[in-house]
Amino acid sequence: MTIPSTVREVIDRGPFRDDWSSLADYPVPAWYQDGKFGIFVHWGAYSVPAFGSEWYPRNMYVQGSPEYEHHREVYGDHESFGYKDLIDRFTAERFDPQQWAELFRRAGARFVVPVGEHHDGFAMYDCSRSEWTAVRRGPRRDVTGELAAAVRARQMVFGVSSHRAEHWWFFNGGMAFPSDVRDPAWACLLYTSDAADE
């Protein structure tokens, strides 16, 4: 099997076309229609600064933004301490998947969907294709897998959301000034559309 090299190839191989009428034919699962209430979780290395939002990793490289200024004040210059350095500070030391799942169940949730990988390229699950995973860096545990087991044990549906499609441009701001984004040693995480053009 060959790996598709373009988005068009992926679409052509899939069950849908890239238009709304094709998606409209998709049968919505009964568990979703009947679920009424679910929990979507945004949590990852971007929560370390406890500043801004899950877009901190992008905005910290946008000169003049509140996140950029916060990062400089708290961590120093972006060349010496960038987003990659926040990842190992993301320890998830108080993460208790059983406690989370029980809270979700008591709230009446029927399904739980965490973001498995945000635009930052850091996978919250075990993955053989990257060293930038919660199993290999930061918490050094499969937080998504642990949460999945706890949620399913309580008879709730578990899903995972991937936001990686926007990773290719997410760190572009760091190319405009001296930052770790410009260092080829970190290209496997801090990928930019500029790198795609080379």
Regions found by a protein language model. Name each.
Residues T2-F122:
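N-terminal structural segment of carbohydrate-active enzymes
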Residues P27-V28, Y32, H71, R140-D142, ...:
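Catalytic-domain carbohydrate-binding cleft regions of carbohydrate-active enzymes
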Residues E79-D96, D126-D142, V181-L190:
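The substrate-binding groove and active-site-proximal loops of carbohydrate-active enzymes
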Residues W100, V143-L147:
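A general structural detector for well-ordered alpha-helical segments in enzyme core domains, enriched
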Residues A107-R140, F170-A176:
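Aromatic-lined carbohydrate-binding/catalytic grooves of carbohydrate-active enzymes
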Residues A148-R152:
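Surface-exposed amphipathic alpha-helices with a cationic face
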Residues V157-W169:
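Aromatic-lined carbohydrate-recognition surfaces of secreted/lumenal glycan-active proteins
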Residues Y191-A196:
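Conserved small/polar residues in nucleotide/adenosyl-binding loops
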